[in-house]
Every structure is written in structure tokens, then in C-alpha cells.
Amino acid sequence: MNNQSPLLKFLTTAPVITTIWLFITAGILIEFNRFFPDLLFHPLP
């Protein structure tokens, strides 16, 4: 009846998905800031 593996059931829980999503978002921001520095900071005129 339940043929889903325990690892797949664990990986589809909300805290795990949220943690993975935050790591991906942080990685994108870090790499963007590495290749294009100072674009994330806009000083006031």
C-alpha cells in the first residue's frame, strides 16, 4: 500500500524543502555578488 521509501518521505517534508531552498537562494545571491560586485548596493543620491 505504502511503497514510498523512508528517505523520499523525509526529503519531502517542509523543513527539509525550506532548508534546501534557502541554501539554493543563498548560493545564487553569493555567486551573483561574486561575479557582479556592488550591484546589490544602491546608494542614495
Swiss-Prot record:
InterPro entries: PSI_PsaJ, PSI_PsaJ_sf. Its main location: membrane. Belongs to the PsaJ family. GO terms for cellular component: photosystem I; plasma membrane-derived thylakoid membrane. GO terms for biological process: photosynthesis. May help in the organization of the PsaE and PsaF subunits. The keyword Cytoplasm does not apply. The chain crosses the membrane at residues 10-30. The gene is psaJ. This is Photosystem I reaction center subunit IX. HAMAP family: PSI_PsaJ. SUPFAM superfamilies: Subunit IX of photosystem I reaction centre, PsaJ (SSF81544). It is a single-pass membrane protein.
